[in-house]
């Protein structure tokens, strides 16, 4: 058996995008291609050669190619789903591939899925009050499973998240749900360096358009943010914890 066949296979969607492209750049710059076989979904033909030159296996297709996604998920040990947190069909196709892999090969892969903090939003009837004055405010804790399980299915991104939860409940994959708030900063590396966040440029555009910066109410609202480089590092930390440290455990 060659060293290549011993490598764990990573499959990433959104690999030429803002978050996924930043993750890919960090992996390539740190020689992850020596330890992993990395494949990335690409929609544009001109990205195929770019990925090949980086040592990445291009998978030509889109999120609408359900059979392709199922096939790739079935082959992967680790999946980064960073393309679209509202594309339910692609998430279901990936989970189907992981389910087949588990039942046919007895292998439980790792699925790291990108959702968004919009899933925690609620309706507002005005400027609101501070958390200390709001007796119905909910403080979120990653360790509080029951609170997260109670999020209604009509919340933003939630229908897709439930596809990931299904894989976890069935025990066919080890799942991680990434729920970043506003991601800011220029993308990292050649695949993502020309990409920026959605929210911050919109705020800047509105400021330029109205020739003044605006705020809501008294300006005391809290808006969490994370830099795209820090977020990419978190994905790799999960990859490390689920592969390197676990494989070293007795």
Question: Predicted segments — roles?
Answer:
Residues 4-33:
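N-terminal Rossmann NAD(P)H-binding glycine-rich loop of SDR-like oxidoreductase domains
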Residues 39-46, 62-63:
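N-terminal Rossmann-fold cofactor-binding loop
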Residues 52-78, 86-90:
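Conserved Rossmann-fold cofactor-binding substructure of NAD(P)-dependent oxidoreductases
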Residues 184-196, 217-229:
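Glycine-rich "substrate-gating" loop/helix at the edge of Rossmann-like oxidoreductase active sites
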Residues 202-226, 234-238, 245-249:
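A conserved pocket-lining segment of Rossmann-fold NAD(P)-dependent short-chain dehydrogenase/reductase
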